[in-house]
Every structure is written in C-alpha cells, then in structure tokens.
Amino acid sequence: SIEQAPIIKQRTITAGLSWKKKYKDGNGLMTTSLSTNRLGNIFSRFRDNISQSNVVFENDSYEWETKIRLKSVRYFDDWKTVIGTNFQNSTYSNNTKNVLYGLNYNTKIKFLKFGLYARGERTFLNDRLDFSIGFRMDSDSFSEGSSLTDNFSPRLSFSYKLKPDNRFKWNLSIGRYYKMPTYTMLGYKDNNGNYLNKESKYTRSDHYVTGFEYNSSNSSRITIEGFYKRYSQYPVSLIDNVSLANKGGGFEVLGNEPISSDGKGKTYGIETLYQQKLNKNFYGVFAYTFFYSRFTSIEGEYLPSVWDSRHLISFSGGYKLKKNWEISARWRFSGKTPFVPVNINATLVSYPEIILDYQKLGTVKLNTFNQADIRFDKKWNLKKLSFNLYFQIENFLVQSIPFPKEYGLNRDQSGFLIQPLSLVELSREDRSNTPIPSIGFVIDF
C-alpha cells in the first residue's frame, strides 16, 4: 500500500577515460584507466507518506569512488600473459535512523581498496588444448576480517578439442572468487559509535564448471554444463538469524544491521544452451537451467534461497526481413520461488514497517513467472549516420507477475482506522498483466 512504500531518491554521476599504448617491440599493449563515480541514495519510510512526516526509518547514504586500473598484455613465444592491478579510493557516508530498534547514528569512512591479478594462456597438443591459469588478490585498508593473502583467488580452465575438426569440445573451469562486504555493512554502527561489522570477512565462492560443446556449424553451437558453486564466509543477519541471500528481495536497505561471516551456501545444477548466430536471416539463444540453491541460517541449517526456482528458461532471437525490417522477441520463465511471509503480530507493532517471518522460509512459494516481449525495427542507412525506429510491446502474452500477499491496517469504507487495530490482507488490482507498448529511435553517427 502507499503507506508502506518507501520514498527513494537517487542521483548518480559517472566519468572515465582510458589510454592504450603498444609496447615498442610490438608484443603487447598497456591500458591505463581512470574513472570516478558518485551515488547519492535517500531511503525513507514515514508513517504518513503523503505529508512525509513522522519518520519510521531513514537511511541517507553517499558513495564516491575513484579508480585507477593498469593492465598489461604481453606475448612471449606461445604464451599470452595478462598482468594488472587496481587502486580505488572510497568515501562512504551514512545517516541512519531506525525507530523500531532505537538506532540513530552518522558514519563516514574513507579507505583504499587494492588488488592485483595475473593470467597466462597458451595452447598445447597441436592446438587441441587451450589452457589458462591465473590468480587474483584483493584487500582494503578498512575492514579487518581478512588480508590480501587471505583473499588469494586461484583460477584454472581448459578446453580440449575431442575431434580434430574442432566441433566437439570438453570444457572445464575451476576458480575461487572473493567479494568485499558492502559499504552498508562496513559503515554500520551502534549508538555508541562502534563499527560492529568492521571484522567482516570477504565472501568466498568456489566455482566448479564442466561440460561439452558441440559446434554443428560455423554459426551454431550446443552446450551442456554441470556447475557447483560453494559459498563460505557469507554474511548472516544476527537480528533475523538468516542469510542475507534470503533478504533484500524488495525495496530495502540490505546489510544495515549486525552480521556474522559464518554463513555458507551452495548452488548446483545443469544448464543447456543453443546459440544460433545470424544465418539465413535468423539468430537466437535458448537456455534452460535446472538448479538448487541453499544458504545456511545462524544455526547452520541449509534453507532454500529466495531465487531457488528450480527451473529457468530464456529465449531471445529475431528474424531479419527485407528492406531493413526486423522482428525480435524475448521470453523468460522461472519456476516457483520461495518467499518469506509476513509476521502479522510483529508487523502490527512496527507498522508501517513490514516484519517478515523467516522461520517459515521455504514453506510457501510464489507462482511461476512467465513473460514475453516482442519488438519491430525499421532501419535506414544514410551516408554519415543510420536511423533506427522501433516499436516494442512488453508482456504481449498478458501474463501476471506473481506477488506475495500484502497486508494493511483494517479500515472502514470511509478510510478511517477500525479500533482495535488489526491487519487484513489487501485486495489489489492486478495491473502486472497489462501489456506495455513503447516506441523509440536510435541514431548512430
């Protein structure tokens, strides 16, 4: 309802430039990049959204990042080497007020983030084996949970041509990846000014992927892969006792709470893909994934993640007609996904802030998601530019988007609250199944 919706205001600025220079011997290239970006995000929830008075929750955050990246590509005999480093100056400030938990603090942190990586590539066995090995390391000057060596990420991959005609391949890749805690987590403080998440660790994920690829022609290929992703040091909420992988599905501030880095997770499944490059006026990509996704609570129990839909299907493709006409379509399907139901009693106390009942995670699911879009393009090629006019219809199959049940305070026909206060399920007019037409143009110089 309107009284539950947060008021969100955002502003972003991004700028950057890069400089590339070949080495004098001609065996490589050095790329230097400089970029900066700013993000201002004001997130507020009021008891009265119309007048925007009586604040319940407020989170005003500002981020400023300045990055320098260096990348060197060199060729030595049969080897291709890639070496790089990055430096980032980060400034983050946050003003938070949470009436429900009696929290009110201001924070400002400024720190450096740095990393380095290296990779070597070459072919063996008469060009039948493509081999790559490398690593990456990351750290920062603020968080104390892990160091540069703790975040060492080795990676290995190869592709072996099972037949000399290069049509049938076996692919395998193994890698470790680290992700820094978010600014919201690192900047979280209690009322005494203590940074409660400063010792949070980088989230670790180990990826194992293997499969086969068959190139039936120069313009089409079929792949089937099995994957297993294992997560550790994953942030877990100490308030709700649930992994942050199962929070933040809506418009919320994620990580603005005390967390533990003891969470674990795993995602595994099979994916098959068919890709057709432009051939006989047709192009397209079709993919199907069957998977499981689980993350642990504070007690170590594995629970389904909120994106554990079991089935994912996607298609995008098109057909080029005569006289520069083109028709294209996109289709997405997702199986039933778990969601967290509302805790009625707790929400009645905290209203308009909605409290979810994470104890019931995995017991209820949303219906399947199914949506298709269609687009028509007409292109004119002129001497110095091209003009593309398009007409698009989103959700042209008129499918509804599944939503969990919503609750609001019980009111009479005049809109006045009924005493004693109670929550009732809201009846909503389903407009998610409405097709959305749009028209636009693109000019290329």
Residue ranges and their predicted role:
Residues 284, 332-352, 367-371, 378-445:
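C-terminal beta-signal and adjacent terminal beta-strands/loops
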Residues 56-71, 107-117, 197, 201, ...:
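Outer membrane beta-barrel strand-and-loop segments of large Gram-negative receptors
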Residues 123-129, 228-230, 254-341:
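Gram-negative outer-membrane beta-barrel transporters
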Residues 40, 91-93, 146, 160, ...:
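Surface-exposed extracellular loop regions of Gram-negative outer-membrane beta-barrel proteins
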Residues 34-40, 76, 87-93, 135-141, ...:
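Transmembrane beta-strands of outer-membrane beta-barrel pores
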Residues 6-147, 161-164, 220-223, 277, ...:
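Face-selective signature of the C-terminal outer-membrane beta-barrel domain
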Residues 78, 107-232, 280, 287-289, ...:
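Structural signature of Gram-negative outer-membrane beta-barrels, strongest in the C-terminal barrel
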Residues 9-13, 62-66, 108-114, 148-152, ...:
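Residues that define the transmembrane beta-barrel architecture of outer-membrane proteins
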